[in-house]
């Protein structure tokens, strides 16, 4: 549903450039960079193609983008960056390298939107490969990287990995499930709460605590919510 709006915004920017030839070259570059950034999201979830547009936008722009809110969600409702961008068996190392290379360009033009994504994806890759100690080290690095930067969607990805790691090794999570949910409720953002509840549902299902699965999932009420709805 959002693709037509994104294309409309891109066309408005291109029309503005065409209608105002007097624009300074620097501002023309900024507007063209915005167009590249918008186009990159239409390539989701192909990190190779998205990266091409991020690099192009980074080369053209001298200011942060105005088409992206740096405090908005980065993961499209997913609690896992790995689940978002791992597309093909055997390509994980390539995908991790592409994330490492492209994200600094993206951060530059979005004021750090999604900061820590490549770090938590690396941590998840270690986890999926059974390298639990390396996963824990990378997880703590991700937590440190996002501390105080407002990237709640990445923090939720960290929480989800911490939950899964706690099943496989003896680690201390930063908050109890109840404490973390209370913290999220204080932010008055139902998207974050729903994402967190989805990770709790997974954890309780895997550990056999089915009576603790949040009602949204345990009672099969997903059709009643929109995970991407603001607030």
Annotate each PLM feature.
Residues 7-15, 29, 123, 127-231:
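Helix-coil-helix junctions within alpha-helical repeat/solenoid scaffolds
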Residues 1-158:
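Internal alpha-solenoid helical repeat scaffolds
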């Amino acid at each position: 549903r959002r693709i037509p709006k994104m294309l409309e915004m891109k066309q408005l920017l291109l029309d503005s450039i065409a209608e105002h030839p007097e624009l300074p070259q620097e501002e023309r570059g900024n507007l063209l960079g915005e167009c590249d950034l918008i186009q990159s999201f239409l390539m989701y979830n192909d990190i190779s193609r998205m990266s091409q547009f991020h690099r192009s936008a980074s080369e053209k722009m001298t200011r942060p983008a105005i088409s992206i809110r740096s405090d908005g969600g980065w993961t499209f409702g997913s609690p896992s960056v790995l689940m978002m961008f791992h597309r093909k068996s055997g390509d994980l190392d390539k995908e991790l390298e592409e994330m490492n290379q492209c994200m600094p360009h993206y951060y530059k033009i979005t004021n750090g939107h999604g900061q820590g994504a490549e770090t938590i994806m690396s941590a998840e890759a270690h986890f999926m490969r059974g390298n639990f100690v390396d996963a824990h080290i990378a997880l703590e690095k991700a937590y440190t990287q996002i501390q105080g930067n407002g990237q709640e969607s990445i923090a939720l990805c960290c929480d989800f990995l911490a939950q899964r790691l706690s099943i496989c090794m003896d680690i201390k999570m930063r908050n109890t499930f109840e404490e973390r949910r209370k913290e999220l409720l204080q932010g008055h953002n139902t998207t974050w709460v729903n994402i967190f509840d989805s990770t709790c549902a997974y954890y309780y299902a895997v550990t056999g605590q089915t009576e603790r699965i949040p009602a949204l999932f345990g009672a099969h009420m997903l059709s009643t919510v929109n995970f991407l709805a603001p607030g």
